[in-house]
Amino acid sequence: MANPTLIGALCALTFCGTLQAQTLTIDIPAGALQPALDQYARQTGVQLLYRAEDVQGRQSDGVRGQLDPGRALDALLAGTGLAVRRDGGAVMIFREAAGPSTAGNRDQGTELNTVTVTAQKRSQSAQDVPIAMTALSARTLETHRVQNLQDVARLTPGLLVSAFSQANPTIAIRGVSNTFSQIGVNKPVGVFVDDVFIPRNSAASFELFDLESIAVLKGPQGTLFGRNVTGGAIVINTRRPDTERIAVEGEIIAGNHGERQAKGLVNLPLGDGAALKISASSRQRDGTGRDRLTGREQDDIDSQNIRAQALVRLAPGVEATFSADYGDDSNGGRTLSSDTLGADGDVRTSELGVNQDYQRTIKGISARLAWRLAAGELTSISAWRRSASSEDYAGVGASYTFLTSGSQSVTRDEDEITTFSQELRYASPKWAHGNVVTGLYFSDEDGARRLGVRALAARTGALASATLAEQQVDSRSAGVFADGIVHLAPVVDLTLGARYTRDRKSASLVRSDLLRPASNFSVSALRNTWNEVTPRAVLTWRPAAGLMTYLSATRGFTSGGYNADASSATAFRMPFDPETVDNYELGLKSQWLHNRVRLNASVFHMKYRDKQELVNNTQTGILTIFNAGKATVDGSEIELAVKPASWLDLSANFAYLDGRYDRFVVGTVNNSGNPMSNSPRRQAGIAADLRYPVSFGYLVGAASYAWKDSYNTGAANDPNLQLPAFGLANLSAGVESPDGTWRLLAWVKNTNDTAYLLTRSTQVVRARYVGEPRTFGLSLTGRF
């Protein structure tokens, strides 16, 4: 063990002086704790004293951003079961039992994890950001086996993820969503991966692996994230390459329904501040559903993903991160099960008689350049992405052989989206009186879609209609934004920001009807431009350490567009307007008992103007996107986290939502006063995870339960589209080696085997689509 007197003297000269100095730019990725502490010492100049056996095998969530060394060290050690003692300038790290706890020492062993987020385009602790959010660390994502956005929703109050088809998942935050599938039509919840916007939900439903954090930002984020975030944003940060150590990690999973999965990564330091990391995932699973007419499996999984990242120090203070990713997914479609004609009473079988199929590829490259200067930081993010998908599915929940009238629709839906985006922003240092972030943004999106629909007549299967819609929508968006914080007093901040966005869309549609050629039409070169200013104002008060309250007013907007699914030229030529949301919010973020208890809460009031909804116009009989007029959403959310011991984390959350259409009249139908679609009134969840030390290593485990209230999926409040309330429980338990190099885990999802509904359908017959059944298995993880 090193000489404590010598270390104490060094710390007195370095650490204490650094604490009083200007904040430092610190960048330490999530991973093993010992190399993280070594990087901390190099980046801060602080000398640390610890025993190797105390830190071996422990993991850290990392830290990134402009922080003082003391707070950065707290963040690195949070949740590790280690404590920090500062005595006479010395900085000593030890197990809880290794030394006494005094009133002047913070007990790091029972502190909750600190999650670093970029919600304000800076790296900050989630507790320091005056925005309602749920922030999930790398440790939480791994512990609770988060593999997709539906798993994220289990741990996030106010987030709903469901689907009618594989290519068109629905994502709602605080009830803000839409179910549009047309090309060039925007969603009100934005998904961002490493600050790159994913323009279509079908490209956002990918396998989640090798992540640093996920933050779900709630409410409009129009100032810093631009258009199409009226409901909020899901910000996904991948783990960056580590320039300090060679690392190999892997996990093998096997389970019921033929589940087999392998994922892993290799990290290679290249010297001179450069590193390369390659991570990959491959997953296969047999179908959990079956079409009893064709015998084909449905809801199976066949997914492969790979990501490569290179970090290069181009010059002192200049860093570049280059990324490339590729994903390929396929399955046999979803199990849309009839509960009327042809039904056999089993929700895991369908009566479609159609060879459903889903194929998708996504790929992208990006370059992130950061210049750290004395006058601030300049960041450039350039990205190119392409997604292509095709899906064959039955839109009616029963084969034509069971129908007594009408017809069975069979759809082939193909789309391809190519996007280039460029963001350039400046972040000032933390000046005495505040700081500012400002920047420019541009995106160019080209979207093409071929939508073919055949109608098979009842009983006979004769071709009743056959239409093909070839859609093309090109979108250009440019924006300029600024967001600044002014310190009005030592404990009071005022944040003011605004963004100006200009969207231009051009659209074309060629629609042909094989049996009724007289109805064919072609419309090209439709163009429209929409401009919007989205401001933000936040008043923040920090009356005590670990306590923050905020009052905010924000605006978001979802861009306008064209009804590319229109069945008449007149309907296509008529654009719909943008929707805007003004959000007024009062929030609290607090930490108690030396960060053993965390309590966050918010109440909000949202006012919609021109809300976009897909409804059937009773006067024309055409399914069209309309601006619904006005709507109001009131709600509240609360999240509680407690760490009663170094080996145990507990959490609970609750969300309340009351959203209604104030004015919404379409043709002869008045939807005013109806509840908003995809808006469960109540959501609640509890979770626990443990890492208990024993003689042979650690006992590890996690448990969670998430409950959602009943809600309707349509604006007309059709009782046939009402989904019942449900709750899901997940469990895992296992053992981990003393040094953390391996872990064996048994897990089960949907423990009670609940047949919960993702959606209902009323096309010709009533039908339903249920979520995954109970799944269970084993996983073996290794880290070297």
Protein language model regions, located:
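Outer-membrane beta-barrel domain signature, strongest for Gram-negative TonB-dependent receptors
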Residues: 271, 295, 299-436, 443-445, ...
